[in-house]
Amino acid sequence: MLDTLLINIGQLLTMDQEDGLLRREAMNTLPVIENGAVGIENGVITFVGTAEEAKGLQAREVIDCGGKMVSPGLVDPHTHLVFGGSRENEIALKLQGVPYLEILEQGGGILATVNATKQASKEELVQKAKFHLDRMLSFGVTTVEAKSGYGLDDETEWKQLEATAQLQKEHPVDIVSTFLGAHAVPKEYKGRSKEFLQWMLDLLPEMKEKQLAEFVDIFCETGVFSVEESKEFLLKAKELGFDVKIHADEIDPLGGAEAAAEIGAASADHLVGASDKGIEMLANSNTVATLLPGTTFYLNKESFARGRKMIDEGVAVALATDFNPGSCPTENIQLIMSIAMLKLKMTPEEVWNAVTVNSSYAINRGDVAGKIRVGRKADLVLWDAYNYAYVPYHYGVSHVNTVWKNGNIAYTRGEQSWSTATI
């Protein structure tokens, strides 16, 4: 007997087409079962099909979804989840046209977050991150990547990673940990970036032994770390058994996309300034292009990543919030879906695949997350929507009704749902 049977699902978005990364037309294809049903037993999906095919199945709990849509839990593959403080005091300065470097000189910018993170205890960081994780869950996210990077020293980086490890044990959302010690060059290492990178590399053996990070990341950008420094750093991390990511070409076409493809990074992230050659190399690689349009939007920039071109050229594109206190303070992955549709010229189908299938591969979870398939864990979202296009179309709010994590209800809107409303 099943534990739970979901029936009367108007659109069941299984996302279950070919295995592996989705490109080109596959990104624009959504496997949908009309009038679907899903069976769950011991936290695992044991039945996927039509309501007609589900007749005769017995379950301890039968949930009538009222003709609404069900999808896999969403995957957010790029966040800076664990940090201290906030930076709302900088908004007025930015609106007045104060340059970022001047804000830095006043102790603001990333330095403000670094200082606040250093001052916070591990438990304070954990409790703050739980608040943000709860919000992510309420937007339908069941798997998330979380980076360190607000320490720029060994003690605080360890603290962030240990906070992430505690969150992995205490919160229902699955968390994939990334070490981003090479987020910036500290003032005391100005002009000595290679020495700083060596310091960060020296932390990796113990980090691997304690299993505090699965990925290593670096910020490859003008004035931070060069392409050659980034490649050398990440290749050494790979030699130690880590998978790697790269903050690439966020501002300038520096060659970060090319470097990511060349070294076999799991993902290259941002890519606003990626060159034509970089896009071509990504298309011919297994590196996911994780685009972060919410950051471009919040920074009030005119030029967004060329998502349409990337998909047309054959790049496997994912979307993420880039949740962080400075350049994208939002946990709302649904808002990112809307911005991607409007500013990256992605179709609703491409957007959905970019927050499920491809985003799961960006963090090496393609075999466990992002699809509704028999044998996979029951990470599911019931939406207050009757078709998939409605979610990115009606922007700025959450359309989530209920989230199941490993077959258990982890979030529900409860009586506030407009279940009887007509769209």
From Swiss-Prot:
- Which GO terms are recorded in the biological process aspect for this UniProt protein? L-histidine catabolic process to glutamate and formamide; L-histidine catabolic process to glutamate and formate
Query: Pfam families attached here?
Result: Amidohydro_1 (PF01979)
Q: In which pathway does it act?
A: Amino-acid degradation; L-histidine degradation into L-glutamate; N-formimidoyl-L-glutamate from L-histidine: step 3/3
What does this protein need as cofactor? Answer: Zn(2+); Fe(3+)
- According to the UniProt entry, the coiled-coil residues are none
Q: Where, by residue number, does 4-imidazolone-5-propanoate bind?
A: R87, Y150, H183, E250, S327
Q: In terms of domain of life, where is this protein from? A: Bacteria
Similarity comment: Belongs to the metallo-dependent hydrolases superfamily. HutI family.
Q: What is this protein called?
A: Imidazolonepropionase
Q: Which organism is it from?
A: Bacillus cereus (strain B4264)
